[in-house]
Amino acid sequence: MTQIYSFWRSTGMFAALLLCLLCTNLSAGTIYVQTNLVSNVLGLAPTTDPNLINPWGVSFAPKSPFWVSDQGTNLATLYDGAGNIKSLVVSVGPTPGPTGQVFNGTSSFGLPDGSPAVFLFSTLAGTLDAWNPGIIPITTSITVATTPGAVYTGLANGSVGMANYLYAADVTGHINVFDTNFTNVTSTTFAGKFVDPSPVAGFTPFGIQNINGNLYVMYAQLKGVIGQPGGFVDEFDTSGNFIKRIATNGQLFAPWGITLAPGRFGQFSNDLLIGQFGNGEILAYDPTTDAFLGTLNGKNGMPIVNDFLWSLEVRTMGPNVNLDALYFTAGIDNQMGGLFGEIAPVPEPGTITLLLAAAGSGGARKLWRRMRA
């Protein structure tokens, strides 16, 4: 009996200690760790790619590598979820290069070879460019639309009924919409759409993303290419009707990237994550109430920061993809460099439970040995 009491006292105290550590971790918030995967800077990441300069938008087919828009080199480069470089490199658009991009999983947006575009890009030159494997050479895209005076900084796709569209964020103050013939239908089919009923002077559309069938537009106050403090995020349906404002000013600093967190992402699981181009932080919001929840913090308790943060992406499948991670791109070194990486919660979900189980099983084995002695 003394041995049994001693066992429960020792293992119980250890379990209590672990429980205290767990409670402390929960009250302090989940710790997140960043893993650099690819960079143009030698030694900054396991993989070095000189083509990765100021990477903006990212897209992917369900089982494809990540396609990354390298604005600084006018290229699209491909990486798997572990940062391994794929051999295909695609030249995209006129200088000054690609920004947003989308994967097209429909049979629409046909190209001259008769097949639909697979990946589409927006550019700072005001063009839309498209690629599919039938283009010759396969390492180039083709320009399918040009809007004089436009500066496209983001791209999304969506549908209204059976009709498919492309939506381009234009920092001159518009969301321009294109049909499947790459015709600009902003002033016709979409006349008077994508209007915020409470506009904020000096702010312009900067990024755009389709999340669960609605379009989220990020607005920023821009001076050249440098974001100014502030910003807001609006939600529209794909017809361009205003639904609500998601977030405004507060912690926002030129928002651009946005996504829903994975289901196993610590305290911010399934929450809305918004990346800040202006200060490199990632903010979390409740996807139902739109309440601000906090920032993704590292081991030092401070926000994880990546200068000139662009895309935020989450995947449910793909080659070497971490399904519990948030992938990102950033134009480090004042947009003269590039970084592609992932952010994941630490400890991983279930770690404490496993420790408790290990402690219990280890203590049980010790008691068994004592009782047999």
Language model features with spans:
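Bacterial N-terminal signal peptides
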Residues: 12-23
